[in-house]
């Protein structure tokens, strides 16, 4: 697609293509002949057209004769977006086979699905942080002492209140390892189970 510029005409296609290649490879203009260098400098001073925007500057088309030099931004259909969002709600990360399967279902490439998921994760993270809903780690689960109902491989059917020696618990674990509330709860449950 020709640039809209007074310095550009249809005969400049070769110069323009060369300029794009030099820009992409970061080659200095000083390696060019002086008459071509001046045209490259004029081209480099122009604002990029829609086809040369920084978003699209990375990938050149494999077909040099096709008027388009850059890949355009892909707009997904409502059905594709719906399916991507539905799957994202189920699973925030997809394995390669899952990506390929989803891509084939909604007629996208696995790379497009991967990038959509990356962008959507970032979008959700940013939205959470803006709302002050930053994910806080859950507190670690509370440790609770459980009464031993088996002793030496045999069920403890005759467990009595005197078996709860204040110095040690039946398994030989020091009393200090359990909170007083946990032991009281265990004593109450043991008495309830065996005396009622």
From Swiss-Prot:
Q: Where is this region: Disordered?
A: 48-72
The protein's GO terms of the molecular function aspect are: DNA-binding transcription factor activity, RNA polymerase II-specific; RNA polymerase II cis-regulatory region sequence-specific DNA binding
For whether the record's keyword set contains Magnesium, the answer is: no
Query: DNA-binding as a keyword?
Result: yes
Q: Which UniProt keywords apply?
A: Developmental protein, DNA-binding, Homeobox, Nucleus
A Gene Ontology term for the protein's cellular component? nucleus
Q: What does this protein do?
A: Defines dorsal-ventral domains in developing brain. May play a role in defining positional information along the anterior-posterior (a/p) axis and the dorsal-ventral (d/v) axis of the developing nervous system. May be involved in determining positional or boundary information rather than determining a given cell type.
PANTHER family, alphabetized:
HOMEOBOX PROTEIN NKX, HOMEOBOX PROTEIN NKX-2.2
Q: In which tissues is it expressed?
A: Forebrain and midbrain.
Name this polypeptide is given = Homeobox protein XENK-2
Task: State the family it belongs to.
Answer: Belongs to the NK-2 homeobox family.
The UniProt entry's GO biological process terms, in alphabetical order, are: cell differentiation; regulation of transcription by RNA polymerase II
Q: Where is it localised?
A: Nucleus
Where is this chain primarily localised? nucleus
Q: DNA-binding region(s): which residue ranges? A: 69-128
The stretch of residues making up the signal peptide is none
């Amino acid at each position: 697609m020709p640039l809209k510029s007074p310095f550009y005409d249809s005969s400049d296609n070769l110069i323009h293509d060369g300029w794009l290649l030099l820009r992409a490879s970061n080659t200095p203009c000083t390696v060019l002949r002086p008459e071509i260098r001046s045209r490259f400098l004029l081209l480099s001073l122009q604002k990029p057209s829609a086809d040369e925007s920084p978003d699209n500057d990375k990938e050149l088309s494999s077909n040099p004769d096709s008027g388009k030099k850059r890949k355009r931004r892909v707009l997904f259909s409502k059905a594709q977006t719906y399916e991507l969002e539905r799957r994202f709600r189920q699973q925030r990360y997809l394995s390669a086979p899952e990506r390929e399967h989803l891509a084939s279902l909604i007629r996208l490439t696995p790379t497009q699905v991967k990038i959509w998921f990356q962008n959507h994760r970032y979008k959700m993270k940013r939205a959470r942080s803006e709302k002050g809903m930053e994910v806080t780690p859950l507190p670690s689960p509370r440790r609770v002492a459980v009464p031993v109902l088996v002793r030496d491989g045999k069920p403890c059917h005759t467990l009595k209140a005197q078996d709860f020696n204040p110095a040690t618990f039946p398994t030989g674990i020091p009393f200090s390892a359990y909170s007083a509330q946990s032991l009281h709860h265990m004593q109450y449950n043991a008495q309830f189970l065996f005396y009622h």
